[in-house]
């Protein structure tokens, strides 16, 4: 009986927290069903009435009048291309850093890690000018800019995992005649799957939710 009472209290607390977290999301959904003028005049947290109800007309207008599908496509392309580029380049970079123990690899590692503490706002104007000069100001090349900003976290995560990967497996593959690229793609990549998934989720959430960088750089 005492155990049941102890389990009820955390359940109640978590339920209240869940309701508080879900409530704004539900209100966003309800406000999307109101007429535009009612969103500000009737209050954000008020349920739509018969006078303010607009149904799915707002969604139809966003698709037909505001190029929502085009914007969604660009967001999808930028996110997928950026994440794929980050995963490929940073996993290879981390492999080099761990396996080639030299001054260059150490400098490269600390340079990537240091990039995590550099906010975009600090280099925003310079980067915008550079992106215009190098033609990195469109949805298909901005992924190179995202690679630069996302490399720090990705290299840091991949480096830690590669250090725990046994070198003997790679040496055995090299003895069997595998080239370095074959060792990387056929041996290391399958071992790195957990880290690849974790890094992909983090980078995808960051790129997808980012607004300031593409707003500053992209010219369509």
Model segments located where?
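A structural signal for multi-pass alpha-helical bundles of membrane permease subunits
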Residues: 2-218
